[in-house]
């Protein structure tokens, strides 16, 4: 399951792919070395075998420890009242006797030794070191007989030291056995008393080989644990211990935190790289669009020369109009109209290309009603009904707005359901155009229809252009229905006083 942390999503971006490969290599490098033993006990055995006992900081013979420091002089429980070994009532009587040296004597045979000790203190009679050696060492009230006796007879303190608990003795010099014992925790003391194969105390590892305990410093301990692929913690109530040796809980070395950190770094790096790559692509596209716009500007500028020449030619024909045969009148009219439209298109394109993201230029239309009425009658031959709430003068971009309205009307006539209506609502600083047919499109279809090259009735590209132009004029376009209604809202200057 560890290898799943290093499974990364494929990408076609070379820089991100290179980073992914680098971090994958790092992930696998952090995984446990395959030469490690498979099972946890085998790894612990490997850990033990890595120690050089000649490099131990010191060593102690367990038999000497047992001789010099009996178990009762080591365990912390010995410093507490021994209520589990003596009748509580007799301990209470013994306590009263020790306080006043008078009173009823306890009768339990278990209390004989403490009674002898207490009466000796009351009478002032001496006790030889041999008595302490033969005794149970620990007083029923906790602590040793020797320490209690030395409190009353300080001159005997040095002679009675071997019979005192390690916590009752003066602090030993650093590096001595007593120093190590006095600084051990309860779990370490219990591990030592039980003869555990290893246990930890402070920064030292006590490692048993035969009857000898060898002490190794923390650096050696950690180095060998890493080599064996192990992690450890000292025994506590909060830990779940899979395999315990002394007071040490062993587990396979866990790289999950490091791997998790690496994956977070990878995700963040990928995000920044994707953002950088997206910014680079956006700038590249923007530069490409600018180059194309420049070319279009040049072409538009160059088109003005032949259009101007064509206009002069048409003007020459106009001056000789009376000499033209009647059979050419219709062709000449179309030539004049096409020449005018070409000139408008060139000017509108120049305006569009030069304005960049600015609103398109606009001119005053003296009568919105007359402008639209001419468009409806001339170009749609009565297939479209015009409705206008109030005629006004408005400042509009006639060419592009006319193109947008034409596009919507042609779509409605060609793909919609008759009758088709163009409704114009004029307000102060706003003109709204509504192109309605009896189709069934609703506002839910707008997101799909506005995509370029959508094949639904061939509307996609035209609507995309219309929406773009409306946006350039500072307006907005929307769809409502049924019936199908395309709405153009164009902010503009208006003037009702001139009407």
Swiss-Prot record:
Q: Which residues carry this modification: Phosphohistidine?
A: 301
| Enzyme Commission no | 2.7.13.3
Q: Which PROSITE patterns match?
A: HIS_KIN
> Impact of changing residue 249 to A on the protein?
2.1-fold decrease in vxrA expression and 11.7-fold reduction in survival following penicillin G treatment
Q: Which residues form the Histidine kinase domain?
A: 298-494
Knockout: what is the outcome?
Mutants lacking this gene display a significant colonization defect in an infant mouse intestine colonization assay. Mutants show a decrease in vpsL expression and are deficient in biofilm formation. Deletion of the gene results in a 4.4-fold reduction in vxrA expression and a 134.8-fold reduction in survival following penicillin G treatment compared to those of the wild type.
A cellular component annotation (GO) from this entry = plasma membrane
Q: Which domain of life is it from?
A: Bacteria
**All ranges on the Periplasmic side of the membrane:** 32-257
- Disulphide bridges, residue numbers: 101-122, 241-249
Q: Where are the transmembrane segments?
A: 13-31, 258-280
Query: Which top-level enzyme class is recorded in the Swiss-Prot or TrEMBL entry?
Result: transferase
Q: What is the effect of changing residue 139 to A?
A: 1.7-fold decrease in vxrA expression. 11.9-fold reduction in survival following penicillin G treatment
The UniProt-reported impact of residue 117 to A is: 1.2-fold decrease in vxrA expression. 3.6-fold reduction in survival following penicillin G treatment
Q: What is the effect of changing residue 204 to A?
A: No effect on vxrA expression. Does not affect survival following penicillin G treatment
Q: What does this protein do?
A: Member of the two-component regulatory system VxrB/VxrA involved in the regulation of diverses processes, including virulence, the type VI secretion system (T6SS) and biofilm formation. Functions as a sensor protein kinase which is autophosphorylated at a histidine residue and transfers its phosphate group to the conserved aspartic acid residue in the regulatory domain of VxrB. Is critical for colonization in the infant mouse model. Contributes to the resistance to beta-lactam treatment.
Query: What the record says about its domains?
Result: Contains a unique periplasmic sensor domain (SD) and lacks a cytoplasmic linker domain between the second transmembrane helix and the dimerization and histidine phosphotransfer (DHp) domain, indicating that this system may utilize a potentially unique signal sensing and transmission mechanism. Detection of the signal via the periplasmic sensor region may induce conformational changes of the dimer and close the transmembrane helices TM1 and TM2 and subsequently the cytoplasmic DHp domains in a scissor-like mechanism, which changes the activation status of kinase domains.
| Name assigned to this protein | Sensor histidine kinase VxrA
What organism does the record attribute this protein to? Vibrio cholerae serotype O1 (strain ATCC 39315 / El Tor Inaba N16961)
**Classification lineage:** Bacteria, Pseudomonadati, Pseudomonadota, Gammaproteobacteria, Vibrionales
């Amino acid at each position: 399951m560890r290898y799943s942390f290093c499974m990364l999503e494929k990408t076609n971006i070379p820089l991100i792919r290179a980073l992914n490969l680098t971090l994958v290599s790092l992930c696998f490098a952090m995984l446990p070395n395959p030469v490690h033993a498979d099972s946890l006990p085998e790894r612990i055995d490997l850990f033990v075998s890595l120690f050089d006992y000649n490099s131990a900081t010191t060593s102690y013979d367990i038999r000497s420890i047992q001789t010099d420091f009996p178990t009762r002089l080591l365990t912390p429980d010995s410093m507490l009242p021994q209520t589990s070994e003596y009748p509580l009532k007799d301990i209470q009587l013994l306590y009263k006797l020790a306080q006043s040296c008078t009173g009823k004597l306890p009768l339990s045979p278990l209390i004989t030794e403490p009674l002898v000790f207490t009466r000796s203190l009351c009478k002032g009679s001496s006790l030889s070191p041999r008595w302490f050696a033969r005794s149970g060492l620990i007083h029923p009230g906790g602590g040793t007989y020797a320490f209690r006796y030395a409190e009353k007879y300080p001159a005997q303190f040095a002679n009675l030291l071997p019979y005192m608990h390690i916590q009752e003795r003066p602090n030993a010099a650093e590096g001595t056995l007593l120093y190590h014992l006095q600084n051990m925790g309860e779990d370490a003391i219990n591990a030592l008393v039980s003869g555990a194969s290893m246990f930890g105390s402070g920064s030292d590892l006590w490692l048993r080989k035969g009857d000898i305990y060898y002490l190794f410093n923390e650096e050696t301990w950690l180095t060998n644990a890493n080599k064996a692929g192990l992690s450890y913690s000292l025994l506590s109530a909060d830990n779940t211990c899979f395999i315990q040796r002394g007071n040490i809980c062993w587990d396979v070395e866990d790289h999950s935190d490091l791997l998790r950190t690496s994956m977070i770094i990878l995700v963040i790096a990928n995000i920044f790289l994707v953002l950088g790559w997206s910014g680079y692509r956006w700038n590249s596209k923007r530069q490409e669009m600018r180059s194309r716009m420049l070319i279009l500007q040049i072409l538009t500028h160059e088109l003005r020369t032949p259009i101007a020449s064509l206009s002069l030619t048409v003007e020459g024909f106009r001056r000789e109009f009376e000499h033209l045969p009647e059979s050419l009148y219709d062709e000449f009219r179309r030539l004049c109209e096409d020449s005018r439209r070409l000139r408008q298109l060139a000017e509108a394109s120049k305006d569009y290309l030069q304005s960049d993201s600015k609103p398109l230029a606009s001119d005053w239309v003296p009568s919105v009603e007359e402008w639209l009425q001419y468009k409806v009658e001339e170009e749609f031959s009565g297939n479209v009904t015009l409705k206008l709430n109030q005629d006004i003068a408005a400042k509009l971009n006639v060419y592009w707005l006319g193109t947008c309205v034409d596009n919507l009307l042609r779509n409605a006539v060609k793909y919609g359901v008759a009758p088709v209506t163009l409704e114009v609502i004029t307000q102060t600083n706003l003109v709204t155009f509504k192109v309605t047919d009896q189709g069934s499109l609703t506002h839910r279809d707008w997101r799909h229809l506005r995509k370029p090259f959508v094949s639904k009735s061939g509307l996609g590209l035209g609507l995309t252009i219309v929406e773009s132009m409306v946006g350039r004029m500072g307006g907005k376009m929307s769809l409502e229905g049924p019936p199908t209604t395309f709405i153009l809202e164009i902010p503009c200057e208006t003037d009702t006083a001139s009407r």
